[in-house]
A protein has these predicted regions:
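Conserved PLP-binding active-site segment of the aspartate aminotransferase-like
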Residues: 202, 368-381, 395-430
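Short amphipathic alpha-helices in soluble, non-transmembrane regions
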Residues: 383-392, 429-434
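PLP-dependent enzyme catalytic core of the Aspartate aminotransferase-like
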Residues: 225, 407-457
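N-terminal entrance/gating region of PLP-dependent enzymes' catalytic architecture
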Residues: 1-111, 395-396, 413, 433, ...
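Conserved PLP-enzyme active-site core in the AAT-like
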Residues: 4, 11, 118-296, 301-303
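Short Gly/Ser/Thr- and Asp/Glu-enriched loop/turn motifs at secondary-structure junctions
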Residues: 109-111, 146, 362-369, 408-410
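Active-site C-terminal subdomain of aminotransferase-like
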Residues: 231, 244, 248-251, 255-368, ...
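A common structural junction motif
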Residues: 391-399, 434-441
Length: 457
């Protein structure tokens, strides 16, 4: 008589016969696995990741409320590209970009055009493509060559602009960032632009430091260039972070469609738009600034759908989350949330400035992001890379990195304060920072410089 062996549910799950093995990583296993075990393997491996709430390196949102999480769970299976299949979701997408058009002072929000994207990098590339195509149209109409287009931008641009210029054969002309000119401010701009310039990029919230580039000052410089040379050069605003900060914390700042030279603005819904990744937005001042030839009308699932995107299928849930927040927070709520983040940023920067070896690069007065460097008088036994490494032992992820190419000898650390980072956590961070700084200052000899930690964004 065969004795049937019975198994009980045990914890850990891997005590069951056949499961006390190393999971296949680079190929499909021949056999199935119980869902509980597969879940536990993935769950356990991701415990080795950093804590998202203590990640002060990322701009990406890491917290939403329970209602948003419920809405997310209800809509994760919707594809944003299926506008014929999900018409109300498509209508909500349009509601969102029209809200942004009005927020950014489009002269006539009813006649503008925009779209959601997978993130602000795609949004930037779409804005850049429109600039290139309009430049090509104007050159051809004038009987001129369309060879050798260029784009002018700060040396501190986010890497998506380097990709854009590389992928679409555009010469990137970088205006240096220096200690005298901490941002691209329009100085010496006439030596960078010419008849082949498709546009100028201005950044509302530089990735390295969080500082705003003075858009009006850049626009004024381009006005002067046009008066002198006749060159009419447009601006794209990369407002990945600042586009959802400036309207609420600096409402009197002139940076958006109030300036005629601004043709398009992009932002990130998953940064200070407060949505989970990935979501971006790009809006044009008026519909005629987006060349019709770039818009595809695709027959898909029984309907004709206009689309302008680099991606095709992408989640619709984040668009619905953005609309939820627009309804939930309104101007007053967004102002409160962003002000709370900036209050924490200024509290942190003030506390760091009081610690002996540090000198602030900026204090978080633009977006809630700031950077600092070591004073010349600081100990030579350690660097900010070592401090970043020490802070990891406390659970904090704080990047250290060199400034752009024109400031190669300056290393900074940067903190991004996001929604959900409380004043209490900030106080705990300052305590840990002081503790690790004291530890490093007490070293009798220099720390090794090989294998310094790095963050890649």
């Amino acid at each position: 008589m065969t004795q049937e062996r019975k198994f009980v549910t045990v914890n850990p799950l891997f005590a069951r016969p056949g499961e006390n093995t190393v999971a296949a990583k680079y190929e499909l296993s021949d056999e199935q696995m119980l869902p509980e075990t597969a879940y536990q393997i993935v769950h356990d491996e991701t415990m080795l990741d950093g804590n998202a709430r203590l990640n002060l390196a990322t701009f990406v949102g890491t917290w939403m409320d329970d209602h948003a999480n419920r809405l997310y769970a209800e809509s994760y299976d919707k594809n944003m590209i299926d506008k014929d299949e999900y018409p109300q979701t498509a209508a909500i997408e349009e509601n969102c970009w029209r809200i942004l058009a009005k927020l950014w002072h489009a002269p006539d929000p009813a006649s503008t055009i925009g779209t959601s994207t997978i993130g602000s990098s795609e949004a930037c590339m779409l804005g850049g493509l429109a600039l290139k195509r309009r430049w090509q149209q104007a050159r051809r109409a004038a009987g001129k060559s369309t060879d050798r287009p260029n784009m002018v931008m700060s040396s501190a641009v986010q890497v998506c602009w380097e990709k854009f210029c590389n992928y679409w054969d555009i010469e990137a002309r970088y205006v240096p960032i220096t200690e005298e000119h901490k941002t691209f401010d329009g100085h010496d701009l006439d030596s960078y632009v010419d008849e082949n310039t498709i546009g100028v990029v201005a950044i509302m919230g530089v990735t390295y430091t969080g500082m705003y580039e003075p858009v009006k000052q850049i626009a004024d410089a381009l006005d002067a260039i046009q008066a002198k040379t006749g060159l009419d050069i447009a601006i794209h605003i990369d407002a990945a972070s600042g586009g959802m900060i400036a309207p609420f914390l600096q409402p009197d700042l002139v940076w958006d469609f109030q300036l005629e030279r601004v043709h398009s603005i992009s932002t990130s819904g998953h940064k200070y738009g407060l949505v989970y990744p990935g979501l971006g937005w790009v809006i044009w001042r008026s519909a005629d600034l987006l060349p019709e030839e770039l818009i595809f009308k695709v027959s898909y699932l029984g309907g004709e759908m206009p689309t302008f995107a680099l991606n095709f299928s992408r989640p619709a849930a984040q668009v619905l989350l953005q609309y939820y927040l627009f309804l939930r927070l309104g101007r007053d709520g967004y102002t409160q949330v962003q002000q709370a983040a900036q209050d924490v940023a200024k509290y942190l920067s003030a506390g760091i400035a009081k610690l002996g070896p540090f000198e602030l690069w900026n204090d978080g007065s633009d977006i809630p992001v700031f950077a600092w460097k070591l004073k010349d008088s600081a100990s030579k036994n350690w660097t900010l890379y070592h401090l970043s490494d020490r802070l990891r032992t406390e659970g904090w992820l704080v990047p250290a990195y060199p400034m752009p190419a024109d400031l190669p000898d300056i290393t900074v650390q940067r903190i991004v304060v996001r929604n959900g980072f409380s004043m209490d956590l900030a106080d705990k961070f300052l305590t840990d920072l002081a503790k690790q700084t004291t530890y490093l200052d007490q070293l009798d000899s220099p720390m090794p410089i090989e294998g310094q930690p790095a963050f890649h964004h």
